[in-house]
Amino acid sequence: AANYTLISDRIAPSGAVSGAAVKADGYGLGVKPVVRALWAAGCRDFFVAHPGEGIAVREELKDARVHVLNGPISNAINDYVYHDLIPVLNSLDDIALWQHACRDRNRKFKADIHIDTGMCRLGLDLTETQTLLSDAPALLDNIDVQLVMSHLASADDVNSPQSAQQLSMFKSAFDKLGIGKQSLCNSSGVFLGPD
């Protein structure tokens, strides 16, 4: 909780808020005591890798926003809906799957959009991002987009130009989409500057 408080205090003047990654059983510390401590410190957004981890967080915190980084899984859609988990959509296929889930249930469900700006791990690649930007209203019609996110690949290297390049790409995509809130920085990125 001390790290969360340090980062939250650092970004508070900008109006930004922080979330916490609690993957892998709270990084081996036990997800339930970790999320309780973070909740007490003011954290409301929790990031996990898989829906099972999200369910564990939801069982402990009924009012938290629980984001599942690895995207929706077709055979677990009911788990996302029932437990109010927010999938991170990492590809056009993820967007189509979540769009279908929303239409089937005649409801708008929350989701985050992840754009790969250089991490090369998760997120829409450049081609998919261009497709999304050119047809966002149709592709995201039934989706309640909460966050548009990316992840800094070299934030721990203050001399790397990659973070500035990623920030520029991310801002451009976010501005064109015009929906949701921005989420870019990992812990190290917060200390690179106010942008």
Protein language model features and the residues they cover:
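Conserved phosphate-coordination/catalytic loops
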Residues: 1, 89, 161-164
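A charged N-terminal "starter" segment
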Residues: 1-86, 99-100, 144
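A cross-family glycoside hydrolase active-site/sugar-binding cleft signature
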Residues: 19-22, 47-49, 67-69, 88-90, ...
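Active-site loop/helix belt of alpha/beta enzymes
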Residues: 24-37, 41, 83, 95-110, ...
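Structural motif corresponding to alpha-helix initiation and N-cap regions
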Residues: 51, 71-74, 92-95, 126, ...
